[in-house]
Amino acid sequence: MTEWRQQWQAILHEFRKQAPLGRGDVVVIGCSTSEVLGERIGTAGSMDVAAMLFAELDAWRRETGIALAFQCCEHLNRALVVERETAKTHGLEIVSVVPVPKAGGAMAAYAYRKFADPVVVEAIRADAGIDIGHTLIGMHLKPVAVPVRVSVKHIGSACVTLAKTRPKLIGGARAVYSLENPNDSCSF
């Protein structure tokens, strides 16, 4: 577990440098603790692994004010555990379910038990995301997702994929994306 914690800390350190997030920004976390253990997703969930991962994420949350959203497994349609305040702030519809390790996944179940005022919502548009073990978090990211590359690519046996998001660039060839080089010309 010590080696996994060190891997996790290294991943989060690099991710935070490349995706500077602050108060109110939402980070979605999808995690198969089974995959961390080297087992097939959904077969060997571990509350101990979930606790280790959660501790580092919670420290990041307390330091920066980010909001965490923990994706449940497919048995709960990949719904998300968030704090009630996050649901209110983002206008998210709360659904009635309590995640457990066998229906929701160990990570979401653990987060539900550790949050101050947890609720479950069906969807969110997160500013960034962490996918541990191919849990498919893309449905919960804002467009446009941008991959974040880090030097440590695994926690235990689980592949880790990271993403941040950026606003869409709209407008075509004459569009301006910075006031430093305005295209003020009206000629065609």
UniProtKB/Swiss-Prot annotation:
Signal peptide segment: none
Organism from which the protein derives: Geobacillus kaustophilus (strain HTA426)
One Pfam family linked to the record: DUF436
Classification via Gene3D superfamilies: Hypothetical protein TT1679
Residue pairs linked by disulfide bridges in the UniProt entry: none
Protein name in UniProt: UPF0340 protein GK3370
Family of the protein in this entry: Belongs to the UPF0340 family.
InterPro entries named among the record's database cross-references: Antibiotic_NAT-like, DUF436
Superkingdom, taxonomy of origin: Bacteria
